[in-house]
Each structure stands twice: as C-alpha cells, then as structure tokens.
C-alpha cells in the first residue's frame, strides 16, 4: 500500500539525505525536481530518469512504457497502456452518436489572485476534449484566463475539485454562471487530470459520464429480479452490505466500486457470514446444499457469478446500482 512506502518529501523539495539512505538503484523524477537534488544524486552515483510532461495521451503511453523498461516491468507497463487505450476506446464508442458537446470550464484557480484554467495547448484540454467537452478556454494558451470572458462564455458545466466547490459556488461573480445556478458544477479528483499517468484514462471516463449521462447506463430501478442457478431473487433495494466468497469476486466488486479500494479480503466460514448477516453473498463457486440451506434460513441471497464474464459484471452493476462503472469494466474485460 502507498501508505506503507517511505516518504522522502515532496516532488519539488525532496529530502535527498533520507532518499540516499534508502539506497535506491534508480530515481524517477519530474521536471519539478531541483537541479541541486539531481546533482547530489549524481554525485552519489544514483541514476535519475527524468519524466517530462507530455502533450497528449500518446506521450503518456510512451512515458509508462519507458518506466516499465527502466524497472524491468515491460509486461506490466504494456498491460497498463492497453487498459488505458481500451478505456479511451470505451468513451469514444459511447459518445459516437453525440452531435454536440456541452461547453465546459475547468477550474485550476479562482478569486482575488485571478482565474486559471486549462488553455488549448495544455494536456488537460486534451482530456476534456476526449471526454466530450467543449473547453471554452481552448482558444487561449497557458493557464491564465479572464473573468470577464468566463462570464461572457458562460459554460454549461464547471469542473473542479471538491475542496473548491463551495467557495467557487458562493463567490461573486461566479454565482452568476449558469452552471452554478443550474447545479452543473461537477467535482472530480483533479489529480487524475493534472498528474500524468494511468489515471488519466479514468478521468476521461468519469468526465464523459458527467458531461454525457445519456450515453451511459442510468441508475437501477428497484426491485431487480436476479436469477442465480435455479433460484430467482427479488432485490428490493441496493444492498448495504455484501460478502464476497472468494478473492476473485472481491477484486471484481472493487473494480466496479462496491468495495472500497483500501479494503482487504478476509475468508470467513459460512457460520460467521450468517452471523454477520450481509444483505447479499456473491460467490463464484457453488456452496454445498447444507451450506446453502444455512443462507436460505437466514434469508441471505447467494448470487453465483463468473468473475471473468462481462455479462456477470453488468448484472452486479444492476444489483449494486453502479451500472456506469460496471459497463466500463465489462467493456474492458470483453476487449
């Protein structure tokens, strides 16, 4: 886990002494890394691989491949790039019949020190465009933007991080924007856009779902009838708890957003599961008749799935009301 990795400071202010104490074979650095830090590493005989900001997604793919080669993980890097490209294809397919893209404004900074956004020559502009957004700042270069022009162009959507949402929506003159008045201010983890890497493709998917909800599966309308083996269950509402009977199922539930990313799998006996009384059990192998009877007596539905089957993913999306994410995961699995 990332939390267990030793911290050596920030990207622009690294603790070189601590870094050297870890005896790295290679240091990956962005352009924020100071020349002095590079010199200290060079003097200590530690090679540094600079990762420059790329202009488009193709450049990001190349960067990931380069890192994979540098750390002898070419196969993993290739898999990562393939998954990113598949997600980009997924968005392109879902937006194929869109006639007109909504106008959008990406908030980098706002307020008394000026307005900042992603101009047409920035990497973020490419992400907004790939997600089916018409960036109102695409006709300017760099990051600085005019408040007057923002008000004049009055975008349909405003995209920002959750930290800035309340302040932006309650500060004049932004309160006059149609997006603020109509509730089309959308939040996203802006690191997914600003920091180049595998999550850029996830940002495109998430933004596309915000800007074009009509192109993606809608929320589940309960009740949902689900057939599992010879049994049919009537799911009245979104299950509030779930037990995954295997690590493979657990990982799939993570993928579609049912289980949190930092959760860890724990194998439990049928008796312990029954005592905990989850709303539903998801399994990829049949329980014995005796075990199944215990779940039936406790009124706990057991849904049998094939973790590698894309139709199974769609079904789980319906059960847990995460249809859009399940649709994406199913597309990637089928690719």
Language-model segment annotations:
Residues 76-131, 232-256, 319, 323-335:
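Basic- and aromatic-lined ligand-binding clefts that recognize polyanionic substrates
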Residues 14-18, 36-37, 69, 145-149, ...:
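Short acidic active-site motifs
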Residues 118-143, 184-187, 261-266:
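His/Asp/Glu-enriched short active-site or ligand-binding loop at hydrolase and phosphoryl-transfer sites
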